[in-house]
Amino acid sequence: MGRFRGGLRCIKYLLLGFNLLFWLAGSAVIAFGLWFRFGGAIKELSSEDKSPEYFYVGLYVLVGAGALMMAVGFFGCCGAMRESQCVLGSFFTCLLVIFAAEVTTGVFAFIGKGVAIRHVQTMYEEAYNDYLKDRGKGNGTLITFHSTFQCCGKESSEQVQPTCPKELLGHKNCIDEIETIISVKLQLIGIVGIGIAGLTIFGMIFSMVLCCAIRNSRDVI
């Protein structure tokens, strides 16, 4: 009986440690998602009227999952401390929802990468052509693109040189830069999503083991 209670206590503390880590991970995920969505150059691009909102769906899901992770981390600590099967069962269900959300984020980031790249490239080409037709019409949009991706023009930068960053050294094709930068960012989002999903699996295992151990301890008593 003493060994059984010792094992139960060990599992409980493991779950408490997991929930602390999970809470911290949730905070990091929220900070990461908000910085990616509203920080720096991405903020400038997202302010455009033609901004592809679906491009940010993965980030919205990531931030929402991060907030849920923080709440669930606290919820799981309460369940472990009180040794409540009901609370632990609810905790497992919440982890399952977070797992699904994070997997969705990761899959969307990897699979939707090509669509997002093509959409932003099309936006740039439209702004580029508008500028060539009317130097005032697409001026602001083109400046935003060039500043965001630190590039200038397509095959040549001579026709759009006034809209290019002054600090830019040499010529960088915007079509290529858009593909490179968006690909890297979405891969990072996907890796974070899948990584958190993997962490969630351990939480589900710990919660179920503790729940079963609590039930068995009560049966023994």
UniProtKB/Swiss-Prot annotation:
PROSITE patterns: TM4_1. Pfam families: Tetraspanin. Signal peptide: none annotated. This is Tetraspanin-2. Residues 35-54, 112-188 are extracellular. Residues 1-13, 76-90, 210-221 are cytoplasmic. The keyword Cell inner membrane does not apply. Keywords: Glycoprotein, Membrane, Transmembrane, Transmembrane helix. It comes from the Eukaryota. Belongs to the tetraspanin (TM4SF) family. It is found in: Membrane. The chain crosses the membrane at residues 14-34, 55-75, 91-111, 189-209. It is a multi-pass membrane protein. One of its GO terms (biological process) is oligodendrocyte differentiation. The gene is TSPAN2. Glycans are attached at N139. It comes from Homo sapiens (Human). GO terms for cellular component: membrane; myelin sheath; nucleoplasm; plasma membrane. Gene3D superfamilies: Tetraspanin.
